[in-house]
Each structure stands twice: as structure tokens, then as C-alpha cells.
Amino acid sequence: MALSELALVRWLQESRRSRKLILFIVFLALLLDNMLLTVVVPIIPSYLYSIKHEKNATEIQTARPVHTASISDSFQSIFSYYDNSTMVTGNATRDLTLHQTATQHMVTNASAVPSDCPSEDKDLLNENVQVGLLFASKATVQLITNPFIGLLTNRIGYPIPIFAGFCIMFVSTIMFAFSSSYAFLLIARSLQGIGSSCSSVAGMGMLASVYTDDEERGNVMGIALGGLAMGVLVGPPFGSVLYEFVGKTAPFLVLAALVLLDGAIQLFVLQPSRVQPESQKGTPLTTLLKDPYILIAAGSICFANMGIAMLEPALPIWMMETMCSRKWQLGVAFLPASISYLIGTNIFGILAHKMGRWLCALLGMIIVGVSILCIPFAKNIYGLIAPNFGVGFAIGMVDSSMMPIMGYLVDLRHVSVYGSVYAIADVAFCMGYAIGPSAGGAIAKAIGFPWLMTIIGIIDILFAPLCFFLRSPPAKEEKMAILMDHNCPIKTKMYTQNNIQSYPIGEDEESESD
């Protein structure tokens, strides 16, 4: 018995020092965060539309009995002086006649259009803005929160912020499940932004500090971004199918259970009660923001993701308007983009280091732009498969190239403390998801969905040549002097915090000597 307990304790200690387990935690955190991000994409436009029209139907039904109660028991027929006709007031006939006179325009529209086609185009156009603002609220809050989380990780380490992200995301998921008004949905979406900021900034910073070799770091970040891709992949079809066949609450309750599982693993492995500050002071955020190479990498992340961010609120509404798509199709339409993003991040997480990350990002930006330009030509859901596949694959190329470059640029040109630089990367990601839905909804309402796609497609293509400057970024003078003095390639371990290999847990810490 004692031997088995000792073996269990030893296994726990080894697990807590495992870099692969840390990678799994970050993978799972990004997976669930992005599932919650995208599960609402097919649900919210249809749900808000149904809320509004159910309310209208309820008002009509409550107004109708006032007329029927006074006449139903007294008369078997009524002569109308308006059109010189006699109406029989039996149950079925009375209901039909009154329904026709009270809501004739609604019946006409319903009979002319299939049930899956919304009947009022004006409502859909207005919903572009409403849905866009709801989707953008998460990214806007995350945008504001990211710099503070980056500074916080430098002071207290990564475990506490990433665990705080789990707690906030659980509350947000429960709110989504039981919210029945636009205001509460907006609060839930905004709250998710704070949780996402904690998870993504702390998660990517943790990976950068644990995996110090540039090539190895690129590989594991490609795997971690695979978690993001899986969330984006599973979210829309998962949400749309459960929404249509079970109800709005079901997908969020399933997600809440998965989030609890993630929290239990974090609690076991990361021990988030322990404060683990960095061993050296990182480069100020303002200095990083003045670095043109970091800005180019951040711009690539921003504009590439802005394309899919504009699609999320606008594409389902455009499909409802032009294709009479059913609820489940609104989510399945994003499936090609999600699958190809997963493929892209896993392939180019490894390949980008060999072919040149700058070239990978440049080609990705061009493919994103061309694919987005092709989307408005689709006549049905099958016509969306190829362009959406291209969008997802290309964004996977950009993300899997630019995320490792952010860490590489800090190693090369600044102090190797990663919280702030990955806060900038996440800010860029969030700017795409903040500006994209809010501006995209307004543009789609004003000039139409095809012009919206044309604008963002051209922007992506025009930005692509800037990635050439990332081909061989120069090192700072003091870094170059160190490299020349030691006459060796870049070894990021010489700049990083002490005890990286045993991070984050491990009581027996060994100091590294040069």
C-alpha cells in the first residue's frame, strides 16, 4: 500500500513537471474558449429573430380575444356592411376570418415564402448591426483587458491568470445558457472577453517560456493553435444542430461541463495558488509597440482574422436572406473554414520554419483575400465550400507563422519575457474580431454583403507585401554584441526565467549555470 502511494506521489510530481501536460492544458483552454466563441454564430441571429417575432405574435394573440368573446355566443352569422357579405361564426371559420382581417399581411407573406425564409427583409438588415455589436463586444473587452493581463503575468506568473480565465468562462457559459434577452446575451459575451484574455495571453506566454528552442516553439504553438482551430471547427455545427433539435440551452450546458473538466486539470497541474513572478523585468509594452517588425506581425494576425470575423455575423443573415437556409445550415457553412484552419495550423506549424515564416504569412494573406472575394458568388450552401475552405486554410498559415515570430522577435530584439508580446498578439487578434463584426454589420446594412467581402478581401491582398520585411529582422545592438561575443546561434534559454524546464510546479528547483 505504501509503495503504491509512493508511486502515485512520484507520478504526480513528474506529471506536474511535464511540458506536454502544460501544452495539453493550453490546447484545451483555447479549444473551449473558441468553442464558446463560435457556438453562438449560428444561434444568435436566428434566436434574436425568433425572440422579436414571437413577441409580435404574442401581442397579436392577446389582442384578438377581445373581439371574439363578445360575439361568439350571441350570433351564428354576421352581415358585413363593409363588403356586403355574410360570415358564418363557427369555431374554425371565426378563427380563420378574424385571423385574416387582423393579420392579413402576415398570412400573405407566410404563404408566399417558405418557412425557413424570414419574411421581413428590413428586420434582417437591422439585425446585421445588432448581431455585429454583440459579436464584437467580446473582442472589444478582450482588447482592453489584454495589456493588463500581460503585465500581470510578468508579476505573478502564468498559472493564476489562466485559472482565472477558466472561472470567468464558466460563468459566461452559464449566462449564455439561461439568457433570454439581448442585454443579458451582451453581458455574457463581454464577460467572455475577460476570460479569453486571461486564457490566451497566459497560455501562449507559458508555452513560449517552457519551449525555448525557436523551431520547437513553432511546432508546439502550431499544436496549441490546433486547439483554437478545433474550437472554431466544432463550435458552429455543434451549436446549430443542438439548437435546432434540442434547444438553445443544450450546447451551453455541454460546454459548461467541459469547462469544469478543464478547471479540474488546471487545479491539479498548475497549482494556481502559487505566485511565480518572472526572474527579470520584461521590455515595456510601449517599447514593443514601437517595434515595426512586431507591428507588421500583429497587423497580419489582425487583418487575416478580420475576414472571418466579418463573415460570422453577416454570412448567416445573408444566407437566410438569399438561400432560405435552415438553422443547422447556418453553422455547417463554416465547417470547411474550420476544417481547413485545423489542417493549416498543423501543417505550417512545422513547415513554416523550413520555408520561411514571412513567406508563409505573405502567401496566406493573398489566399485569404482571394477566397473572400469569391464568397458572394455562391448561389447555395455548396458554393460556399471552396472559398470558405480557402479562408480557413490561409488564416491557419498566417496564425501558425506569426505567433512563433512574436516570441522570436522578443528573443532577438528585446528581453525574453513573453507576457506583453503575446498580449500584443492577442490584441491584434481581438482588433480583428472587434472591428470586423461591428463595422461589417454596418457595412453590410449600408452597401450590401458583396461589397463588404470586396473591401476586406482587397485590404488583405494589399497588406500581404509587408510580410517581406519579416524575412530577416535585425537584432538590437546589445543582443548582437552578445551573439558575436559568444560566437554562437541564438539560445533563448540564456535570457529566459530561471527553472524553465521544471515550470510550473516542481518543488525541487535546480538553478541553471551557463
From Swiss-Prot:
Impact noted for substituting D426A: Abolishes dopamine uptake
Transcription in keyword set: no
GO cellular component, one term: intracellular membrane-bounded organelle
Outcome of swapping S338A: Reduces dopamine uptake
Bilayer-spanning residue ranges: 21-41, 130-150, 160-180, 190-210, 220-242, 249-271, 292-311, 329-352, 358-378, 390-410, 415-435, 441-462
Stated regulation of activity: Strongly inhibited by reserpine and tetrabenazine. Also inhibited to a lesser extent by ketanserin and fenfluramine. Reserpine and ketanserin inhibit by blocking the substrate-binding pocket. Tetrabenazine traps SLC18A2/VMAT2 in an occluded conformation and its inhibition is specific to SLC18A2/VMAT2 but not SLC18A1/VMAT1.
Impact noted for substituting D214N: Reduces dopamine uptake
All ranges on the Cytoplasmic side of the membrane: 1-20, 151-159, 211-219, 272-291, 353-357, 411-414, 463-514
Effect seen on changing W318H: Reduces binding to dihydrotetrabenazine. Reduces serotonin uptake
Effect annotated for changing D426N: Abolishes dopamine uptake. Abolishes serotonin uptake
Amino-acid positions noted as binding serotonin in the UniProt annotation, renumbered to this chain: L228, V232, N305, I308, E312, F334, Y341, D399, Y433
Known outcome of mutating S338F: Abolishes serotonin uptake. Abolishes binding to reserpine
Tissues expressed in: Expressed in neuronal and neuroendocrine tissues. Detected in central and peripheral nervous system in particular in axonal and dendritic processes in dopaminergic cells of substantia nigra, histaminergic neuronal cell bodies of substantia nigra and tuberomammillary nucleus, in ganglion cells of sympathetic glia and in peripheral sympathetic nerve terminals in stomach and duodenum (at protein level). Highly expressed in chromaffin cells of the adrenal medulla and histamine-storing enterochromaffin-like cells of oxyntic mucosa (at protein level).
Keyword RNA-binding: no
UniProt topological domain (Lumenal, vesicle) ranges: 42-129, 181-189, 243-248, 312-328, 379-389, 436-440
UniProt-annotated location(s): Cytoplasmic vesicle, Secretory vesicle, Synaptic vesicle membrane; Cytoplasmic vesicle, Secretory vesicle membrane; Cell projection, Axon; Cell projection, Dendrite
Reported effect, N305A: Reduces serotonin uptake
Residues carrying a glycan: N84, N91
Mutagenesis / variant outcome for changing I339 to A/N: Abolishes serotonin uptake
Effect of V232A: Abolishes binding to dihydrotetrabenazine. Abolishes dopamine uptake
GO biological process terms on file: aminergic neurotransmitter loading into synaptic vesicle; chemical synaptic transmission; dopamine transport; histamine secretion by mast cell; histamine uptake; locomotory behavior; monoamine transport; negative regulation of reactive oxygen species biosynthetic process
Catalytic activity: serotonin(in) + 2 H(+)(out) = serotonin(out) + 2 H(+)(in); dopamine(in) + 2 H(+)(out) = dopamine(out) + 2 H(+)(in); histamine(in) + 2 H(+)(out) = histamine(out) + 2 H(+)(in)
Effect recorded for M204A: Reduces dopamine uptake
PANTHER family attached to this UniProt entry: GH10249P, SYNAPTIC VESICULAR AMINE TRANSPORTER
Recorded family membership: Belongs to the major facilitator superfamily. Vesicular transporter family.
Protein name according to UniProt: Synaptic vesicular amine transporter
